[in-house]
Amino acid sequence: MNMLSCDTSHVKSLNVQGLTKLNTLSCGNNELESLDLSGLSALTGVDCQNNKLKILNLVGTTMLTAVYATKNELESLDLKDCVELAELYCNSNKLTALDVKTATKLKVFDCSSNNLSQDAFKKLFESLPQREVGDNATCLIYTEETGVAEGNYKTFTEDELKVAKDKNWKVYKNSASHVQEAL
């Protein structure tokens, strides 16, 4: 089996252990509280948005290039084995820290609407991989949209953003009018 799709199926649990040839998993819009993808070394993409995930186990997912984990209840996310990761959408969770240092191919991520403090952002920016100007690497770090809970630190100084910008990352926020604005 190369692909498994069970979106919007009212699924409360999903066992994918042993599906060693699985490339793509799409299980968004369900009621999952945990998802164990450990050891799925052929997995390149996972879409688990709009669940109730408190645990997303990515240990051994060394080929994973894209993670869509928006709108869950994740408090932590271990990406240490995600060495091929290029896209990460973990916005609208409860993350208090995010370390992407092993994701050396990362070019796009959204971590808005979490619980990332000033210190957590300092560590996150330090962990960002160096990019080339032509990579157009972007990160969306907070939102000002009406009706969206934002727990992230928002009052960045130029010096705080300089670490990311010096690595050729474009840093954005979502404005109240739903437009991405450069910081």
Language-model features, listed with the residues they occupy:
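Conserved hydrophobic beta-strand positions in leucine-rich repeat
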Residues: 1-6, 23-27, 44-48, 56, ...
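Consensus "Asn ladder" position of solenoid repeat domains
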Residues: 9, 30, 51, 72, ...
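Ser/Thr- (and often Asn-) enriched beta-sheet segments in non-cytosolic proteins
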Residues: 13, 34, 54-57, 96, ...
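Canonical leucine-rich repeat
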Residues: 14-16, 35-37, 56-58, 77-79, ...
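Acidic, glycine-rich calcium-binding repeat modules characteristic of RTX/beta-roll
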Residues: 88-91, 95-113, 119-120
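N-terminal capping/linker segments that flank leucine-rich repeat
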Residues: 1-20, 41, 62, 104, ...
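Conserved hydrophobic position(s) of the canonical leucine-rich repeat
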Residues: 1, 11, 22, 32, ...
